[in-house]
């Protein structure tokens, strides 16, 4: 699995700026999705052939006793304890603060690899920046400027050397004994363990535990209606006899790693609770990772008609950027709706892995343009000439033509909908890339 880098520090030291720089290659993929919060806490970065996950923990108040700061501190502690490397960020301009000492005291006790990073160090001599922070007892400080990028590449390379040293060998995704890899994600108490047992069935468990990382990610192979699946542990599910129980609280790190490792993600929601920012953040990460997705709204049997309409409206309003995914209203406890849910898992996987022939893609593109042409931008109208497939899981469609930088986001979404309809691409994100001719005088007007 991809290693996890946790960014920790008191408020306003530049964690979000560093987060954005470390994940910059992925920003464009989600920035234009309507309804998706921009306040992202999880992202992916890559240095060469080494991908990694980043968690921005928010402002860390390690001694907070109550309220929102207490909850943030609890979540931060859990992320730190499960991360492969912790990047502890301090402010080089303002110098050492009492809060930095409290955080350092806590971090030293965790046993995690700690990288002490002095941010906002642009234009300052290293000795002047670093001297204050040696007393934290976390080794040599690394001076960076997250805003300008100074020192960031060297820092993340060092962190990845440590993170990858502890990573087990990657599993073979082409292993024929493995089926579609499914991650079931969601907040605590939404019914993940109940759904797992409904899927696997107590009387016909074909399951075994395989240690993944040192923090015991578990893969459970099972069959359903003659098809093979592999369930990735997301909720600290552990087998008790023939059933699975959730014995750990919600883990951001395990959730991110499971999403990244999956072929299809089931986002499980509680019909009796409003959709939270946490749900939206996790859903956004699924889209960013390009994973096929099915939404399960659990405990549906406990709602009257009015409550059901309210829950559907909440889903449409808060997760409208997931309109490509099928939603199923289920009861894991009563095992209702499970069959339809799994059929959507199969369909989403098939869509994510679909092979799209160039002639058919180009024909679909031409028909879409004939039905609705892109708007002009000044004297220039984009000319869309042909399309081919650039990748799978998620499907990537590459469109060639002239002046394609003038294509609007609205028109891009129109094309996406046309391609989805033509090729039945339900349940998977779809990427569209434009490649323009290098001739600046081509096809003006």
Curated annotation (Swiss-Prot):
Protein's UniProt keywords contain Transcription: no
InterPro entries in alphabetical order: AAA+_ATPase, G_ENGA, GTP-bd, GTPase_Der, KH_dom-like, KH_dom-like_a/b, P-loop_NTPase, Small_GTP-bd
Span of domain EngA-type G: 3-167, 180-353
Residues reported in the UniProt entry to bind GTP 1: 9-16, 56-60, 119-122
GO molecular function term, any single one: ribosome binding
Residues the entry annotates as binding GTP 2: 186-193, 233-237, 298-301
Keyword check for Repeat: yes
Domain KH-like: 354-438
GO biological process: ribosome biogenesis
CDD domains: EngA1 (cd01894), EngA2 (cd01895)
Keywords for the protein's UniProt record, in alphabetical order: GTP-binding, Nucleotide-binding, Repeat, Ribosome biogenesis
Subunit structure, interactors included: Associates with the 50S ribosomal subunit.
Protein purpose: GTPase that plays an essential role in the late steps of ribosome biogenesis.
Family membership noted in the UniProt record: Belongs to the TRAFAC class TrmE-Era-EngA-EngB-Septin-like GTPase superfamily. EngA (Der) GTPase family.
PANTHER family: GTPASE DER (PTHR43834:SF6)
Protein name in UniProt: GTPase Der
């Amino acid at each position: 699995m991809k290693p996890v880098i946790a960014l920790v520090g008191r408020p306003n030291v530049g964690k979000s700026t560093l987060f954005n720089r470390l994940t910059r290659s992925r920003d464009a993929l989600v920035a234009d999705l309507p309804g998706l919060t921009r306040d992202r806490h999880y992202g992916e970065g890559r240095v060469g052939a080494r991908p990694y996950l980043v968690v921005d923990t928010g402002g860390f108040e390690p001694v907070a006793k109550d309220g929102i700061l207490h909850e943030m501190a609890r979540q931060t502690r859990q992320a730190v304890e499960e991360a492969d490397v912790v990047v502890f960020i301090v402010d080089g301009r303002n110098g050492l603060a009492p809060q930095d000492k409290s955080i350092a005291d806590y971090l030293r006790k965790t046993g995690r690899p700690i990288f002490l990073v002095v941010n906002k160090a642009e234009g300052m001599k290293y000795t002047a920046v670093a001297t204050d922070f040696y007393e934290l007892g976390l080794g040599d400080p690394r001076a960076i400027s997250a805003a300008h990028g100074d020192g960031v590449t060297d820092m993340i390379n060092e962190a990845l050397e440590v993170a990858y040293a502890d990573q087990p060998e990657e599993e073979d995704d082409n292993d024929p004994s493995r089926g579609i890899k499914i991650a079931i994600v969601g907040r605590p108490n939404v019914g993940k363990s109940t759904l797992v047992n409904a899927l696997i069935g107590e009387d016909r468990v074909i399951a075994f535990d395989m240690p993944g990382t040192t923090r015991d990610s578990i893969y459970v192979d099972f069959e359903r209606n003659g098809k093979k699946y592999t369930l990735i542990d997301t909720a600290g599910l552990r087998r008790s006899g023939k059933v699975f129980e959730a014995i750990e609280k919600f883990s951001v790190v395990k959730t991110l790693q499971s999403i990244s490792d999956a072929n299809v993600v089931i986002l499980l929601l509680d019909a009796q609770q409003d959709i939270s920012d946490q749900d939206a953040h996790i859903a956004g990460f699924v889209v960013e990772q390009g994973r096929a997705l099915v939404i399960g709204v659990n405990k549906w049997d406990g709602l009257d008609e009015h409550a059901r309409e309210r829950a559907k409206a909440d889903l449409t309003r808060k997760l409208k950027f997931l309109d490509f995914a099928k939603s199923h209203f289920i009861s894991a406890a009563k095992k209702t709706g499970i069959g339809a849910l799994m059929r959507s898992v199969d369909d989403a996987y098939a869509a994510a892995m679909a092979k799209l022939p160039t002639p058919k893609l180009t024909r679909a593109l031409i028909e879409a343009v004939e039905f609705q042409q892109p708007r002009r931008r000044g004297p220039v109208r984009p000319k869309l000439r042909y399309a081919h497939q650039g990748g799978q899981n998620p499907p990537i469609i590459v469109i060639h033509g002239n002046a394609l930088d003038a294509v609007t986001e609205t028109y891009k979404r129109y094309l996406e909908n046309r391609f989805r309809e033509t090729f039945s691409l339900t349940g998977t994100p779809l990427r569209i890339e434009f490649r323009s001719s290098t001739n600046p005088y081509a096809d003006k007007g």
